[in-house]
């Protein structure tokens, strides 16, 4: 039922309603007792309305016919608006029963007309929640003849909490719960005895919290009981909401101030923003334009009504035009309407009516709470498929009925940039960008411009931190340094020019002109006359204001004086009285004390205001150890925000290499908001206001709140595990670095340095960082990343003063024993039982004109002699001349004794190249050909660096007396290497080769035998691939050789002895014959092609002649040949080989060399560096292809690398490649940045149990830290992954089937060959191999990490292996194990 309905009774499910069988009326009998309150005189008469109680739990109510009242009955009875209140701890007394009116009441009420009654259940109340619930004033409309007899009581909705309004103010009602709170707004009755209650008995309930409010409780009479003389009229029970439209005439009559938007005037009372409170504090408003975002509501202000706009007149219909609603009495359980004369059942203490006992027993008194959609407010309690989402970066989750509501809510929370801050101005009503938000009286007013802001301020009579001349807003009280005291009032200005203009114009601000039209009848501020007379501060003489001399007074404000002499005399008098005055013990201002506090030591402290008392108490509790009192110090620090002086431990803010100090945490927070000190929070990764900066393992981490700091600490501690400790010296959370036991207590430290410093402090050997004295250091603070210790708070404050203004007396160190004794004496005096009063400090002298402090210095300190070197002789300066004298060596040169004035010869060595003959041993059969070969080599001049290096090696010939076959020097220019005869033995194909030679097959092509049955990589499936490299490389153009001759017949393929043992899992059987045959094909093509094109970096005037037999070449020759081979090799049809095919051919060449007992490794040895560089350039251009089944196509497989010993633990480089391959395959590290993030501290061994076989297996775990940040590259998607605390965990499980290829065994071998001090480091994983290490060496690696270029070359080759792209590879291996 709407609250504006007249003549009706509104009852909810919590309203006790007893309908008697003979009278259908609501009893007001003993209202006070029914809610466990005191008996009200209005209703507690002797037994006039008292009824007998029935002890039955369930009551039976009979419903009788009801007739509507006649609409034309006049009103004669007196009416009053009465308020009933009840306490919070009310309990229900008595039982509900059927109501039987007394005989006296029946006689007096005979013939009265019954009223229409509507009884709504709780569902009706919930359906009306969308209607307007907030009304500020309830004024009952009455006939003119009863106007003077009506008492108006205002009920403000501001006293209700938001939750309670939503819960209970949809339809007002009465509750019978024991802990409920009731407010009866209007109780209207036709009984004559009720109207005679005095007004003094009414209680005002404004400002009290309550759950429910009853707008009307009406006593209705029955038609059978007699007629009431004056009857009933609907207007007597109506509630009319009146609004006031301000006009010029109304303001003139009531004496209201100037134009005031948002005010309402009713019956002469001034209402501001919907409330009737007056302006107690002139600074009670807050401007949010500087500290709060414009589109965000100020925290802590929770008003029930929206932003007030200019009032508009609302048409109020008359009482006779308001319709009434029909009768609707339904069962609370089955919702069936109750017929006339039907028996109704009611439970004791409940307001619900039921049609039967079945409904009465099955009805639940407290229904389950309903869930509403956040956006559309739809009931979603029983709805399926609701959406729960976390929106607007909040910690709570919201529930929506559909995705459309979610989208609308997100759009509402995140509006577009253009309409981000557009709202309607309170003054002008324009929908535009808001510049100011003023919170006043629990109402937030939005103002679009400074013009509207000044109009609002002047209209409401608010005092603010604005310039008195131009009206410019000052962010804080300390921002306006230009202050004038005129007639005892302080006036602030933004600059000195405004001060001058204010003096000239005569104290009339210029911005008042904007609101002059609205200030016609205002008495708040009248313009003053030009040249106003002002009283001199010294002699109290009246002088013109602009002739006065201004000077800063002892309180820090500008004071006017008539002359300079008067100013000096007043200062002299004030200086004498100041020493005898009372000074505030906190801010040190000389003012009249408002508060006095007796401290535990018996001293009486004076304070100027309550703010100083609160700050002094808070800071004393923080700085006092174990609750002991600490006497205030004479040293004063200045807060960087409020500019007040204080003598306690300051709050420190380190920002942009500057340290700011504040008197309290509040000033520090306000300073951060005012100066926009924002940073990215280390935990939530959002740009917010800086809360605190904490060190973690020596790294400063900023946080936006205390919650983010605690959550980051938990993640950090969980990541380090048992190694995470808190350093006892620097108090940072870090990994355990040192441990020290002191007096039976084991203490942990981050480093040995902290351990040593803590030990010095513990044994009182450390010195104070201020006075440099040893002893007990009670205070400590972290200053610019270092811990500072001090004797007490006095030294701490002196240290902070030295940072702003250096003090020469504190820089002398511990040698100043007299100063140390003085410090100890002063401390002893302070702790005595009867401390003497401290001497009056010297008066601080300042220059009047420029306000600079005089610098006092000792002259002798800066006078030091200037030392100069001067020769004693008068002759010219002797210059020493050096004459070289060549003397052959070895010759004995006698050196005589000499004096300092004589010249003596000094021997100096000068190296001179001398040719020395060297005899080279050679076999007898080739000694005759050596001179001819040497002459031929000397005649060759090469411009290529590689060829020059190869030609210089021919001067050294190895001896091999057991050789039976002569090497043809003309066919091969280079025969030997530095190693000597060992390589010559390896190059003999007849004596050392264990693999049969491969016959040349010109048409043998690997890409024809193993075609690429795959789709071309396009834009549609490119996103399926992981990132291959950290950067993109352009494919270098390679020359094409000419096609020669017709196709030859295909020869049957030759298979090696290892082909039968190929792994069945490989897609392509590995055959080294493809590589050897490609080499022979390239050598033949190179010899026949006279126009061979080579790369610019490998060009030479005379190239090395190569042979088809690979075993006949030395290391240098193979390096040169393979470098050209990978760039010039072509398929038999003349097309280019794919990069994976070239890598496959090189692997075949390596297997052929290993099978022939050749110990060269073309992929690892330093002698093949040129070939490795050229091969890496080719492999960078490889792009994988996708097969129809979604897998990646590549001709290189993992089994090939194990067969040719590229993977394994037989050498340091091979072990390093194996770890790199396993990390790429199982950890899913596809970029160099991801490999560099690995460290010994993030990879650890772990035991895992198989849930099927219950067998424990060792595994390596790598937990990717969420604190590393997100890379620009794609996220890791491959590998075994587990979710623990939302952090990806990757594992490498032990391979029990083949221990030689087990990743856990390889990692353990790598740890055993690494230095022991690197096992726990967090910044290195891949180590540089030791150059001089052998296979039997205990340590293979150094402590230096591999460079980025080496890791990138390793990654290029690993990414060509097909097995790393198989997602199910590791899971299958795990199951088979």
Curated annotation (Swiss-Prot):
GO cellular component: nucleus
Assigned keywords, A-Z: Isopeptide bond, Metal-binding, Nucleus, Phosphoprotein, Repeat, Transcription, Transcription regulation, Ubl conjugation, Zinc, Zinc-finger
Zn-finger region bounds: MYM-type: 327-363, 369-409, 421-456, 463-502, 533-570, 636-671, 723-758, 764-799
Polar residues bias locations: 85-115, 127-138, 153-164, 284-298
SMART domains referenced in this protein's UniProt entry, alphabetically: TRASH (SM00746)
Pfam families, A to Z: DUF3504 (PF12012), zf-FCS (PF06467)
Region annotation (Disordered) ranges: 85-177, 273-305, 983-1002, 1028-1064
Predominant location category: nucleus
Modified residues (Phosphothreonine): 1376
Cross-link (Glycyl lysine isopeptide (Lys-Gly) (interchain with G-Cter in SUMO2)): 48, 88, 98, 104, 147, 253, 297, 312, 325, 348, 366, 417, 441, 491, 503, 513, 529, 532, 576, 603, 649, 658, 688, 700, 709, 764, 788, 812, 829
GO MF entries: zinc ion binding
Residues recorded with modification Phosphoserine: 159, 305, 838, 958, 1064
Superkingdom, taxonomy of origin: Eukaryota
Function: May function as a transcription factor.
Name the UniProt record assigns to this protein: Zinc finger MYM-type protein 2
Organism: Pongo abelii (Sumatran orangutan)
Name of encoding gene: ZMYM2
